[in-house]
């Protein structure tokens, strides 16, 4: 029998975690992994807008890691379950990519306004969704067990997406627009 997308079990506003526990769809855990899923969709949009195969490969790996985070958040914390691992080396890979991109970028002297090209804007949207996901996971961690590495990865990922947006703008020949406070 083929797997069906629709189950009808969520028609009354609840959804199930891996492990069977049912939660209302407004629960912070559901919001957190739903936002990670939203981030993953935006990263697909960014990846699809790039011609650089190496960066596309990095983004695909990041999307895989976001599924790992989603699986972890979608699992019942009260049950001992085997979920895919997120590793320190995953965070180190983001840091290495940022360091590499930074060697090609001018020093940052001011805040910059998002935009300049649709693909750069998509990357900034992904960055802000990542920050929202991070805030939701932090809020969840204040009430329930959450692996600390998930928070570190999301924090580092938003930094990576900021640097990537700058590198994309540079590669596209788009001038960064600095923000200056009105006086």
Where are these regions (language model features)?
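Phosphate/pyrophosphate-binding loop motifs in nucleotide- or prenyl diphosphate-using proteins
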Residues: 1-183
């Amino acid at each position: 029998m083929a797997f069906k997308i629709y189950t009808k079990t969520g028609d009354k506003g609840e959804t199930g975690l891996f492990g069977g526990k049912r939660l209302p769809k407004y629960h912070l855990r559901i919001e957190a992994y739903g936002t990670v899923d939203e981030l993953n969709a935006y990263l697909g949009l960014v990846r699809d807008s790039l011609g650089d195969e190496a960066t596309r490969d990095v983004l695909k790996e990041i999307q895989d890691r976001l599924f790992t985070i989603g699986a972890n958040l979608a699992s019942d914390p009260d049950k001992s379950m085997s979920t895919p691992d997120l590793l320190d080396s995953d965070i180190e890979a983001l840091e290495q990519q940022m360091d590499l991109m930074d060697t090609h970028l001018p020093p940052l002297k001011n805040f910059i306004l998002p935009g300049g090209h649709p693909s750069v804007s998509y990357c900034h949207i992904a960055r802000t969704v990542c920050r929202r996901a991070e805030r939701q996971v932090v809020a969840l961690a204040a009430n329930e067990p959450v692996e600390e590495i998930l928070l570190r990865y999301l924090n580092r990922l938003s930094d990576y997406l900021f640097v990537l947006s700058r590198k994309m703008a540079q590669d596209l020949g788009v001038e960064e627009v600095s923000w200056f406070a009105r006086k």
